[in-house]
């Protein structure tokens, strides 16, 4: 288990100016407020962070800005989310270059494959950047595939995955994942994307949470 990654890790909102540029002043204010509130890490370029709407150059600018503001005070997770494996690997290598603490990737989407393709996808990402802990982002509402718990635990046991960011809203499946992970020796750090019933996720066995509302008020988490 990636024990260094636990607790509250908000999915950072990327503030933009009226002209669509990164608002670095507001960004610094937001990140510093969350760090001062005691968060355990930050997740940039997730669903809340404009990742699906950012060019490669914009992604790089966002990562650089976050790394400069955070300045090593907390771990920074970087979303490397794209339609297919080679593009994800390009983002992952750039995240490594810019100082990411961990990377987060969904399964491939748009051109949908089966479980063998999904497994190979995560293996290839890990092989490309083995130094960076890799978290699987389970968000079926966006990628139209639910990641099976058995596959996730298997990849955790083999050292491919360090953890899971669960945004499936499937509380039953999450409970089974927690149980299977525990039986396997807890190879995965399990982070819930729940924010309203995050207490229930913790009681079920989550190692941490990724609550979007923490961008507004982090102390409650």
Which residues make up each language-model segment?
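Active-site beta->alpha loop and helix N-cap motifs at the rims of alpha/beta catalytic domains
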Residues: 2-146
């Amino acid at each position: 288990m990636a024990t260094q990654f636990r607790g509250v890790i908000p999915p950072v909102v990327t503030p933009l100016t009226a002209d669509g540029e990164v608002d670095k002043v507001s960004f610094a204010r937001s990140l510093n407020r969350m760090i001062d509130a005691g968060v355990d890490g930050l997740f940039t370029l997730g669903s809340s962070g404009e990742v699906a709407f950012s060019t490669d150059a914009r992604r790089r600018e966002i990562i650089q800005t976050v790394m400069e503001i955070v300045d090593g005070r907390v771990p920074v997770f970087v979303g490397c989310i794209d339609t297919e494996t080679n593009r994800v690997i390009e983002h992952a290598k750039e995240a490594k270059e810019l100082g990411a603490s961990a990377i987060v990737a969904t399964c491939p989407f748009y051109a949908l494959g089966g479980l063998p393709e999904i497994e190979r996808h995560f293996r290839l990402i890990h092989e490309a950047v083995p130094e960076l802990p890799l978290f699987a982002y389970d968000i079926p509402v966006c990628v139209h595939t639910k990641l099976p718990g058995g596959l996730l635990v298997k990849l955790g046991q083999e050292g491919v995955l360090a953890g899971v960011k669960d945004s499936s809203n499937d509380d039953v499946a999450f409970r089974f994942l927690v149980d299977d992970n525990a039986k396997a020796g807890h190879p995965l750090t399990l982070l819930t994307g729940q924010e309203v019933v995050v207490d229930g996720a913790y009681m079920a066995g989550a190692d941490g949470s990724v609550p979007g509302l923490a961008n507004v008020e982090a102390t409650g988490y």
